[in-house]
Amino acid sequence: MHPPEATTKMSSVRFMVTPTKIDDIPGLSDTSPDLSSRSSSRVRFSSRESVPETSRSEPMSELSGATTSLATVALDPSSDRTSNPQDVTEDPSQNSITGEHSQLLDDGHKKARNAYLNNSNYEEGDEYFDKNLALFEEEMDTRPKVSSLLNRMANYTNLTQGAKEHEEAENITEGKKKPTKSPQMGTFMGVYLPCLQNIFGVILFLRLTWVVGTAGILQAFAIVLICCCCTMLTAISMSAIATNGVVPAGGSYFMISRALGPEFGGAVGLCFYLGTTFAAAMYILGAIEIFLVYIVPRAAIFRSDDALKESAAMLNNMRVYGTAFLVLMVLVVFIGVRYVNKFASLFLACVIVSILAIYAGAIKSSFAPPHFPVCMLGNRTLSSRHLDICSKTKEVDNMTVPSKLWGFFCNSSQFFNATCDEYFVHNNVISIQGIPGLASGIITENLWSNYLPKGEIIEKPSAKSSDVLGNLNHEYVLADITTSFTLLVGIFFPSVTGIMAGSNRSGDLKDAQKSIPIGTILAILTTSFVYLSNVVLFGACIEGVVLRDKFGDAVKGNLVVGTLSWPSPWVIVIGSFFSTCGAGLQSLTGAPRLLQAIAKDNIIPFLRVFGHSKANGEPTWALLLTAAIAELGILIASLDLVAPILSMFFLMCYLFVNLACALQTLLRTPNWRPRFRYYHWALSFMGMSICLALMFISSWYYAIVAMVIAGMIYKYIEYQGAEKEWGDGIRGLSLSAARFALLRLEEGPPHTKNWRPQLLVLLKLDEDLHVKHPRLLTFASQLKAGKGLTIVGSVIVGNFLENYGDALAAEQTIKHLMEAEKVKGFCQLVVAAKLKEGISHLIQSCGLGGMKHNTVVMGWPNGWRQSEDARAWKTFIGTVRVTTAAHLALLVAKNVSFFPSNVEQFSEGNIDVWWIVHDGGMLMLLPFLLKQHKVWRKCSIRIFTVAQLEDNSIQMKKDLATFLYHLRIEAEVEVVEMHDSDISAYTYERTLMMEQRSQMLRHMRLSKTERDREAQLVKDRNSMLRLTSIGSDEDEETETYQEKVHMTWTKDKYMASRGQKVKSMEGFQDLLNMRPDQSNVRRMHTAVKLNEVIVNKSHEAKLVLLNMPGPPRNPEGDENYMEFLEVLTEGLERVLLVRGGGSEVITIYS
């Protein structure tokens, strides 16, 4: 409590807190809180001798961000006052005067009674007051307490695409609102399994064996490894992008478009959409191939006995059945998309069972290989679909008669007088084991490639029979297409796509930033292992001619991979059929929603119609367009021709994902803070290079077409072309590029994600034109991890015509210092008659177009208390007011000479952030930027916030930790409780001393003695040039003072001066009897209490960042404002006072 000496001056000074719930606290949006409509709170003054301890110790509310308290302040500075609360308001001079209700004095200027608002007669609608945060109360409407925001900032809602429409439709039909379920899916169910289902597909079952047989084990292993490396590098880049903020529902398109902008985002989004649509066509074609070739071959509508026409007939069958399947699947998606999602797990189970059957069969083949004989004529493979026996003759009733094979190669069914094929005559028909098994050593024969032209007979590579041509009408197994390494790359690549399935479900994930990287990378590792191991197993277990037999003609029409599986080939056939059907349904479900998301962004006007949906959110028009494009893929009818098209679009998409990550990393934008740490721009660049190489390796003409399509979309969206203004060589090119870039920059404020500190550093110069505080420039260089603009400015007071040379010299001095401190930026000096005007001109006019500063950096005016000249601190406060009016952020470095140089490096320590009021998030962003510099890199960030009596400090700490997690900022969190609201004697006396000093200086300035008159006259006449620094330059007071000095001395003026001295002595006598103003006591109480807790927690911190209170609305309180700031920062070595510009500079979203 109060010491005895304090009681002689005051009876009792206490705060009485009466908590009251405010019902109209404004709601806050997830991205940018609405800070403009905060309701005000009521304050009244009363007198009480005692307040029960329970009124200060009991927690009043546990609702963070939803309720706040209304403070009822009891303040009785004099013991002779009456206890009636109305006594406080009886004096007319104590009426509240705000900016809108100011009294107009005789001089025509608005003037309030106190420096700050003193609202003792409260009316509804006035400003917000808080017992412990009185210093910040004037701006509580625009800079609210942290405790009132944390709950809304930490808890955001993530709706999936169409979920809002679904919910609204259900509410309309059911007549009541159902609570929205929060996302609960984890890494395994939400990312890992969907990625497995989308990566494993038709290529694994229908084409991988053929790829191994054609390319050989070594080249096939290389193809699979390159494709898997491409997707792994892309997944790393995607993980960095996905963990750079809260991923909205919408997945990959939103990640790419928000990372690269609307032009690239629209182009890549459409490429991704077309890829997904053609994937649906590919899966449908795969399902039809399994159905017609392996399950029900008799269902074929078109048939041909001619080997050359058989493939054409098969393509027509694929078109008919494919169209029918597409219509059926579109109806399923249109009517019941929920059933598609419900059966997804069943389709995934089919895939997993099929893969396990392959491994089981490979293991079993090592000791008991399955019996699948292959009929060979010499080295040539025969189709066993129409053979009754693998022999030229057969025994019937003890008689040797020609077999069906004889009839295929001879023109007569009789042994005599038959003319047979020459190769048939000279070679024997033998039967070999199609699956020799793992221990057979067949792996050595399958190591090397065996590429064939179209129509070539498949035969053993050891002894080719190229000397005798075969008749294509015979029952040979033929190559249906011309094969090459590049073709196989294009065909196989779709089997590794699908890595974005997890990010597409981002809205359903409980913690997307954790689940997407882990689940995606684990899924790629799993699928890569399966593919690579299957390449080796297929080559080690299956005969080469069987591997190259794409449709299983040599093994009686069985699926080749099915012949290896255990317990039955039908496990693979049925499993692969259902898995391809499921994958097709998933593609037809996802592609329309992707198109709908692109259309809703309204970046491509002619797609706007596809953004409309049914009442339940289903994109009907987008589904119809998707079906039409998929039909084009089905009309192609060949899986081997559709796969390279699909590869192009996915490779284009992956290329831009890697490009986005590489650009963000190299540009080092402040918003680029991925929680996933294992990325590097070199990995992204390597992934981008592999994607580009694969595009041209697989099909160079398809690659060019895909790029042209993407380029046309980019051009359509925004690109208008740069003017060819070359000038004189490289400099002309640089000027043209700079002009083009400046014109492209937005004139308006940038998006929160793109905000970076563009600094205007105000430096002080001494009489020799040297920088007084070079460490301020050092600090600015350490902040430039944001890679923004830096302008170094200073003001020389004088006449421009006379001081132009000095300005050039000072500019060169500053440039040399900038070079020494490695600050890349521009220097701007202004010669002005008055310092305030010069600073105002700098703040208003620096920069060009979109490259304008948004943050002002300046030093604290040290020694302002000791200076007789008030211009030092008046210039400082004027600068604060100008930056506030310009909506710029302000950084004030106190004790800047103690700040570290670029050579010093802290090996440990803390950067402490005291987040008291929210003003845009600058306090969160600055320590992150500082930690990017080597000087501060090893420091840890600690964030403190203040809890009042009514706040739930435990919930505040949880909310703050959650908010920082979403911001991707690693920091230690602590909530400091400030429950004690007693005003101490020290606070009271400190306020009294402050007010006495201000009053005394005011009297001294009004009654200057004449002993300085002659000295001042000589000094003014002899000073030809006076260069003053920011903080101690000419002001309007200069003219007034000089008028006093140069006045003519008369008897009347002497008598007037003598009377003024007597009046001045009476004023000094009044100082001894004055009592401190109540509002100043409360503000001093805030400064003292905050300083106590800050010094207690942060006295050893390497740097303390603190909210800077705004200057008083009434200029009469400027000196008190400086005193409050001094008290607030006493006892701290390095302090950075931060004042936001009023706009959000940091966001949790990507």
UniProtKB/Swiss-Prot annotation:
Q: For this UniProt entry, which segments traverse the membrane?
A: 136-158, 166-188, 212-245, 264-287, 288-316, 434-454, 465-487, 519-545, 569-589, 590-612, 630-649, 650-665
Where is the PTM Phosphotyrosine found along the chain? 1121
Its Gene Ontology biological processes? cell volume homeostasis; cellular hypotonic salinity response; cellular response to glucose stimulus; chloride ion homeostasis; potassium ion homeostasis; potassium ion import across plasma membrane; potassium ion transmembrane transport
Output a single Gene Ontology CC term carried by this record.
Answer: plasma membrane
What residue spans carry the Polar residues bias annotation?
Answer: 80-101
Q: Which residues are glycosylated?
A: 379, 398, 411, 417
Gene3D superfamilies given in the database record: Amino acid/polyamine transporter I
Q: What is the effect of changing residue 654 to A/F?
A: Abolished potassium-chloride cotransport
Cytoplasmic compartment ranges equal 1-135, 189-211, 455-464, 546-568, 613-629, 666-1150
By its UniProt entry, which InterPro entries does this protein fall under? AA-permease/SLC12A_dom (IPR004841), KCL_cotranspt (IPR000076), SLC12_C (IPR018491), SLC12A_fam (IPR004842)
The known regulators of its activity are described as: Inhibited following phosphorylation by OXSR1/OSR1 and STK39/SPAK: phosphorylation takes place downstream of WNK kinases (WNK1, WNK2, WNK3 or WNK4) in response to hyperosmotic stress and subsequent cell shrinkage.
Arranged from A to Z, the UniProt key words for this protein are:
Cell membrane, Chloride, Disulfide bond, Glycoprotein, Ion transport, Membrane, Metal-binding, Phosphoprotein, Potassium, Potassium transport, Symport, Transmembrane, Transmembrane helix, Transport
The residues that hold K(+) are 147-148, 283, 443-444, 446, 497
Q: Where do the record's region annotations for Disordered lie?
A: 1-108, 161-181
Q: Which residues carry this modification: Phosphothreonine?
A: 778, 991, 1048
Q: What happens when the gene is disrupted?
A: Locomotor abnormalities beginning at 2 weeks of age. Hypomyelination, decompaction of myelin, demyelination, axonal swelling and fiber degeneration.
Catalytic activity annotated for this protein?
A: K(+)(in) + chloride(in) = K(+)(out) + chloride(out)
User: For side Extracellular, which residue ranges?
Assistant: 159-165, 246-263, 317-433, 488-518
Q: Which family does it belong to?
A: Belongs to the SLC12A transporter family. K/Cl co-transporter subfamily.
Q: Which NCBIfam families match?
A: 2a30
Identification of the protein by name: Solute carrier family 12 member 6
Species of provenance: Mus musculus
At the highest ranks, the source species' classification is: Eukaryota, Metazoa, Chordata, Craniata, Vertebrata
